[in-house]
Amino acid sequence: MAEVNVRNFNINFGPQHPAAHGVLRMVLELDGEVVERVDPHIGLLHRGTEKLMETKTYLQAGPYLDRLDYVAPMNQEHAFVLAIEKLLGVEVPKRGQLIRVLFSEIGRILNHLLNVTTQAMDVGALTPPLWGFEQRERLMIFYERACGARLHANYFRPGGVHQDLPESLVEDIGNFIDPFLIALGKLDALITPNRIFKQRNVDIGVVSIDEAWARGFSGVMIRGAGVPWDLRKSQPYECYDEMEFDIPVGKNSDCYDRYLIRMEEMRQSAKIMRQCVDRLLSTEKNEPVSSLDRKIVPPKRCEMKSSMEALIHHFKLYTEGFRTPPGEVYVAVEAPKGEFGVYLVSDGTNKPYRVKLRAPGFAHLQAMDFLTRGHMLADATAILGSIDIVFGEVDR
């Protein structure tokens, strides 16, 4: 009997699929149930963020950063304000640095809780999201108490943070850590030894160290390949060089390793949070939270009620903004998903000439074809869950 040429089967995955993690559309080419090719279609959440930021003053551009990786908003703001401070040569007081580090680590836990639990849900486990989101809700309340917003914070400002934390909030964050570690242990015991979860993740989506470097991987994706590359250690910023924490690395470079690294990173983040809380309540208790350079930091409201100059200063700062010296800087932070970078070009005016945002998820999604080729169709959802995609930052 003559051999019949069977054409490969093309299907659409998303953009309405619950496992697509946002508005991802992937065109999958299948040979039976084996994936031959993956073509991710992006741009469904493109809002022209970089261009919009060039039309706003440095203070007005800040909130756009919250809308990129909206799972952990303050981590993006961190990179932008560090870039502005590098241009201006401004030093942030130690208390301001500690508050920034504290909320960056809260953001990391927010991100990893969402990712780990939804990764488990993608392969059929329904309990982890219910447990994980209970802890996330507590952290969102800390966000709300710090700046008034649960999601779009706009809390990190050039020169420091918008306002000091009440002592009761710092104490409550400290009291949150131990119960959280117990809850994390229960989540760990539920997912990690689970036979089905292992079968769906072990030896799936393997990437070598050389391939990971060549494809621009960062964060958990590069550490999963066995490289201890973490910007908090390798290029320390703020007061990370004064913190004690470890960097978990994988050895098999598969989806299961990436899950284990995220679980351990949450424990390390809790460790950093505890160190920040201890210092905020003792040695750095009554220190300022923002730079004393009043060119970029607005005056206090109590000053504005009595001083005409303070009122004029406040008005000028929020209408015209401040000017930065001409130049260009690139600043990267270790965001929960990887290296989030801001390339800022200033022409000496009160608005950035060019802002380029380097989103880690973009490089990771590009590798989807390479990671999924040769796997089964069902493995595509497991791989997508493990690379941790949020479309706000991919599409920008």
UniProtKB/Swiss-Prot annotation:
Pfam families in alphabetical order: Complex1_49kDa
Keywords: Cell inner membrane, Cell membrane, Membrane, NAD, Quinone, Translocase, Transport, Ubiquinone
InterPro entries for the chain: NADH_Q_OxRdtase_suD, NADH_UbQ_OxRdtase_49kDa_CS, NDH1_su_D/H, NiFe-Hase_large
Location relative to the cell: Cell inner membrane
CC per GO annotation: plasma membrane
Assembly: NDH-1 is composed of 14 different subunits. Subunits NuoB, C, D, E, F, and G constitute the peripheral sector of the complex.
Family (UniProt): Belongs to the complex I 49 kDa subunit family.
Protein name: NADH-quinone oxidoreductase subunit D
Source lineage: Bacteria, Pseudomonadati, Pseudomonadota, Alphaproteobacteria, Hyphomicrobiales
Originating gene: nuoD
